[in-house]
Amino acid sequence: MSNPITITESAQSHFAKLLAQQPEGTNIRVFVVNPGTQNAECGVSYCPPEAVEATDTEYPFSGFSAYVDELSLPFLEEAVIDFVTDKMGSQLTLKAPNAKMRKVSDDASLMERVEYALQTQVNPQLAGHGGHVRLISISDDGVALVQFGGGCNGCSMVDVTLKEGIEKELLAQFAGELTAVRDSTEHDRGEHSYY
């Protein structure tokens, strides 16, 4: 069975050092809290032998194993754990592009594939401004109708974001399937607007 999680060599040696200071038989657990939602968060914790569940999947690495619970597993597809060192110091990074939404298969409907692209590629960028976008519908002639929410609602930059960012990205990714991306949101400026 292929391993959905990549742990870089620097992260593996970091974990090995940390685990050397723990009781024997301690490994790590990689998990997702609130998987499949906008509030999904990934984490790594120590996993002593008594905390291993029968439904966990074990992935062996250099000197330790990573355990993943059944619920988190599909949301950790293509996850990468790295240990990076720069001028500011060292830190562990965990990127899980599928944590908020389970990866869809290539033969999934256009609607599912576009929604997946919005959740995994577009919304993480909008989240910094407290905003998000969701797919409402796709017409027979390939026009995707989206709705902005949160900080995007009423933001004066939304047209630029839609045309230069979202539409460009989606039309390139779904060439031949999508023809345009339109905004269905009523943009009334309010306290919540980012700009």
UniProtKB/Swiss-Prot annotation:
- What molecular functions are annotated in GO for this chain? 4 iron, 4 sulfur cluster binding; iron ion binding
**Pfam families assigned:** Fe-S_biosyn (PF01521), NifU (PF01106)
Q: Which SUPFAM superfamilies match?
A: Fe-S cluster assembly (FSCA) domain-like, HesB-like domain
Record: residues binding [4Fe-4S] cluster? C152, C155
Q: Which cofactor does it need?
A: [4Fe-4S] cluster
Q: State how the cofactor is bound.
A: Binds 1 [4Fe-4S] cluster per subunit. The cluster is presumably bound at the interface of two monomers.
Does this UniProt record's set of keywords contain Membrane?
A: no
Q: Which UniProt keywords apply?
A: 4Fe-4S, Iron, Iron-sulfur, Metal-binding
Per the UniProt entry, what are the Gene Ontology biological process annotations, in alphabetical order?
iron-sulfur cluster assembly; protein maturation
Q: How does it assemble?
A: Homodimer.
The similarity annotation says: Belongs to the NfuA family.
Write out the function statement from the record: Involved in iron-sulfur cluster biogenesis. Binds a 4Fe-4S cluster, can transfer this cluster to apoproteins, and thereby intervenes in the maturation of Fe/S proteins. Could also act as a scaffold/chaperone for damaged Fe/S proteins.
Please identify the protein, giving its name as recorded.
Fe/S biogenesis protein NfuA
What species was this sequence derived from?
Vibrio cholerae serotype O1 (strain ATCC 39315 / El Tor Inaba N16961)
